[in-house]
Amino acid sequence: MHRAFSLYRVLELSKARVECVFELGGLVYVSNSNGDLDSYKIYNNEEEEAADFVMEHVDVYPNFTKKPITKVVSCATQDIFYALSDSQVYVYQISTFKKLFSFGAHCQNMCLYGDELIVLSSKKNLEIYEIQKNSKPNLTKTISLNDRPRSLAWVSPTMILVSLSNDFCAVNTETSRISSLNLAWQQSSSLGLGISYIGMSIKSNKLHITRISDDEVLLSKDSQGLLVNLKSLQVSRNPLRWPTVPQAVIYNSPYIITLHNQYIYIWNKETYAMIQQIGISNIYSTFSCHKNTFFTSNSYVWILTPEDFSNQIEALLNTENLNEAISVLSQITVSQFPKRDYYLRITKREKALRSFSSGDYDLAMRLFSEISESPSTVLGLFPGLLDNNYSDAISILSMAPSQNESIESNVLFPGNHSNSQTDLRNGDAVSTVANNKRLRSLSTYLTDSRRKANRFLSYDEEHYFLQKKNLFLNADGTLVAKEKLEKIAVQIDTTLFLIYMISSPALVGSLLRLPNRCETSVVETNLLSAKMYRELVEYYYGKSLHEAALDLLTKLCDEPTDTLSLKGKSNTTSKYEPILSYLEKLSPELDHLIFKYSRVPLSEDPQNSIVIFIDENSEASTISKGVVLKYLETISYKVSIIYLEKLLLDNKFNDTVFPTRLALLYLKRILELEETTDFKNQEVFKQTIEKLEDYLTNSKQYDANVVLQEINSQDEFLSTVSIILYRRLSRHQDALDVYLKILNDWEGALSYCNSVYSIDGETEPYYMLLAEISKNYKSGSLNILDFITKYSSRLDLNRVFPLLPKNISMKSYHSLFSSQFRQLFEELSNKETQSKLYQKRLEDLNEELTKVRSEKVVITREKTCLFCHKRLGKSVISIFPDGSVVHYGCAKKYVSSNHLPYEAY
């Protein structure tokens, strides 16, 4: 315990009883039972040793009120205060103490909400008043309760917390709804039972409402206290326990003050620890002012004033009560104690050092994080870590801290570490369990420091120094320079990497995938020795060390499969999958690396490797197709063909350039194969020609003229290719020349003519072939008469007769002319039949027209529409085949409603 408050007797009373004490404008006012109001000036009396505080009488306001004042609340923004006297509320001006007006009746208590609202409790009612500037408050609502309210506290503009005789409730001022808090009070023996010969009575509970902050309130019932969150109206912590039922409960940050029969107890709000016990008795009233608390008895007025926080903290530190010092400092503000941040830092720092020495590494590192201790200083607890070359991470991090390399204690705490450090070095700390605990706690601290360092480094110079409160500080409390912070960030990431390597290898990948500042040499050495190639490749990628990554992947691909420790590698037929996956992630600006390291995979496994330039998820697919194709041609025509074929399948050609280049590449590939020995029997040669023929036949995008120019007319293996191109260009004579002069294939030429006719309906090739037949009739070509007879329906006889041989007898023409006559007769017969059908149809239509014209409908004045049942009159009508008559506008609806098998127009 330490001395947090001092109690002084400041005023000896005369015959008048003190009913109220309050502070206004730097003076203390005492309301006496006779209605007089005395003002006092309170100050330290340094001349006398017996009394440190003196209340010097300043003025008196005789008969200030008819009855004594029992409670005062002030509203400094409006220069007024409210005084409760004789069950009424009087409003006075603070500067002049002039009474302005009064309001309320039968009032027993009051509570102010800012300068907007005031609530009065009278008997079993709550009266809500709206404060109006320079005028009397306006009563807005009266709420009835089941019991007399004792104490009040505003929760929000629409919610009031009220204590009744035995419970607390929340009152909604808008809806007048009253809700019990239903708090979990535990049964206490202090309630007691009073038993006498005439009966039994239960002592009533004493309930108190003490406002802690805008978000929290302390509710006291009997000998218990509950901290309640005002937003949720839920208990936030375990209950406090008073030694006896308190007469009053007061909050003076950061302490809770309870008045009992013979003592005043001071409690720490956070730890519930009793800080101080002060003896006092015969107190009948308590008044809490802005800073001080006044107690009155029948003879004296006492003042309870807080000690200076500097003295309190010094006392706690001198007694090495660090936990209590940290708790007190955490609850107060800089306005209460200007050196609050400094003392909080050095106290937490000392607590962290002692926790580390005693083996509580988690607490130590958490405290170091809270005070933003420099990582360089914390890492000093691990000897040799900062100066070593990191080649042997396990031996470095498993060492216990030595006395020389530990953080030096602050001058406020001399000589507190040597023994504990010696025990740590010689005891359990060198064990595996202790070392793992140290590593885990250090990793937690470094993770938090890493986040802070990255944020601090993102600040500009001006903003950096404005954030002094949050930045890393050196051991002497000075700010870590931004230049040094860069080096510290490297130490943090590198050390965290080493810790993960030892204690949590699974986390190494997640660290290296994020932006980091790890030392490259350290990462390479440790990951290579551990054969964690996948993590090393990810690190290289994050650092843009792409050549190093690709060199490593190339080396690993050349090794046997069982030595390739690339975790997560998918089952694939390509051993170059790791290289290809890495190349897919490189941006187009790094095309020189993509081309350099994809050459070997493309040469040996083109089908699987070419995907890096095709897949839409690959960055390499955005490289210009022309650039890629030019590069692929330096590897082989085969790879280039595969590339363009896959593009063709994806319909990525918008012009004739690349489709034409694909055809030309086929030709180059064929010529390349023709230079090999025994190429005629090679399956690949046959397949390439078949692919070219199929492509030229089915594709519509290539430029046939360009392709045709590259074909050697003397190459018999490309004759079919030439024919396809001639046909595409409608150069049928050239195509027939290839059939007849190069291939000597008359049947093939005839098939060509039939194919052109069946697809395009063109008959010109027949005449060209007929001309060739007539020239070579004697050389055993096709029989010209059989040809003309067979295809006479497709030919014009006027063009055919000049081509007929003149040295053939007329008898030979019998079959030709017979077929012609049969064809002409058939055409004539078809025309006559068609004419008769047309005539019959015309007669049927005329008959139907006559019938329709003969039909009539008589519309009388009484005839109505079958749909709307209104008279038809002279309206436009629709007549249906069954004789139904409706309005023209009702026709469609009539058809729809009756489901008729025809439409109305």
UniProtKB/Swiss-Prot annotation:
The keyword Disulfide bond does not apply. It is a peripheral membrane protein. GO terms for molecular function: guanyl-nucleotide exchange factor activity. Component of the HOPS complex. Its main location: membrane. Required for vacuolar assembly. Acts as a component of the HOPS complex that acts during the docking stage of vacuole fusion. HOPS is required for vacuolar SNARE complex assembly. It remains bound to SNARE complexes after vacuole fusion. This is Vacuolar morphogenesis protein 6. It comes from Schizosaccharomyces pombe (strain 972 / ATCC 24843) (Fission yeast). CHCR repeats lie at residues 614-786. Signal peptide: none annotated. One of its GO terms (cellular component) is cytosol. Coiled coil: none annotated. One of its GO terms (biological process) is vacuole fusion. Belongs to the VAM6/VPS39 family.
